């Protein structure tokens, strides 16, 4: 029974400290993402979102091209 009380106290202390350490900025983010400025939602976060979007698209395109290359290479017979 004592172990149960100790574990509950530990969980309570860990979960409450993390929650109180950061300020709530949901209203700021909602205001940023809901304003009508013509940008797509995945680019409204700024330069970091733009870079992340471009890197993701480059990796997707590269992976698609590489998979097509591997399919083409595997479809032809190889000399032995």
From Swiss-Prot:
Topology of this chain in the membrane: Single-pass membrane protein
UniProt pathway annotation: Energy metabolism; oxidative phosphorylation
Keywords: Membrane, Mitochondrion, Mitochondrion inner membrane, Oxidoreductase, Transit peptide, Transmembrane, Transmembrane helix
Location of the protein in the cell: Mitochondrion inner membrane
Residue intervals annotated with topology Mitochondrial intermembrane: 76-80
Main location: mitochondrion
Transit peptide: 1-21
GO molecular function terms noted in the UniProt entry: oxidoreductase activity
Mitochondrial matrix topological intervals: 22-46
TM segment ranges: 47-75
Gene Ontology cellular-component terms listed: mitochondrial inner membrane; mitochondrion; respiratory chain complex; respiratory chain complex IV
Pfam family, one: COX7a
Gene Ontology biological process terms, A to Z: mitochondrial electron transport, cytochrome c to oxygen; mitochondrial respirasome assembly
Organism domain of life: Eukaryota
Translocase among keywords: no
Job of this protein: Component of the mitochondrial respiratory complex IV (CIV, also named cytochrome c oxidase complex), the last enzyme in the mitochondrial electron transport chain which drives oxidative phosphorylation. The CIV complex is the component of the respiratory chain that catalyzes the reduction of oxygen to water. Acts as an assembly factor that specifically drives the homodimerization of CIV complexes, mediating the formation of mitochondrial respiratory supercomplexes (respirasomes) containing two CIV: supercomplxes with two molecules of CIV show improved activity.
Subunit text: Component of the complex IV (CIV, cytochrome c oxidase), a multisubunit enzyme composed of 14 subunits. The complex is composed of a catalytic core of 3 subunits MT-CO1, MT-CO2 and MT-CO3, encoded in the mitochondrial DNA, and 11 supernumerary subunits COX4I1 (or COX4I2), COX5A, COX5B, COX6A2 (or COX6A1), COX6B1 (or COX6B2), COX6C, COX7A1 (or COX7A2), COX7B, COX7C, COX8B and NDUFA4, which are encoded in the nuclear genome.
Similarity-based family: Belongs to the cytochrome c oxidase VIIa family.
Protein name per the record: Cytochrome c oxidase subunit 7A1, mitochondrial
Taxonomic lineage from the root: Eukaryota, Metazoa, Chordata, Craniata, Vertebrata
């Amino acid at each position: 029974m004592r172990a149960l009380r100790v574990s509950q106290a530990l969980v309570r202390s860990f979960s409450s400290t993390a929650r109180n350490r950061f300020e709530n900025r949901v209203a700021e983010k909602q205001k940023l993402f809901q304003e009508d400025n013509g940008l797509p939602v995945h680019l409204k976060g700024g330069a970091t979102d733009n870079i992340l979007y471009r890197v993701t698209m480059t990796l997707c395109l590269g992976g698609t091209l590489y998979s097509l290359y591997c399919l083409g290479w595997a479809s032809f017979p190889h000399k032995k």
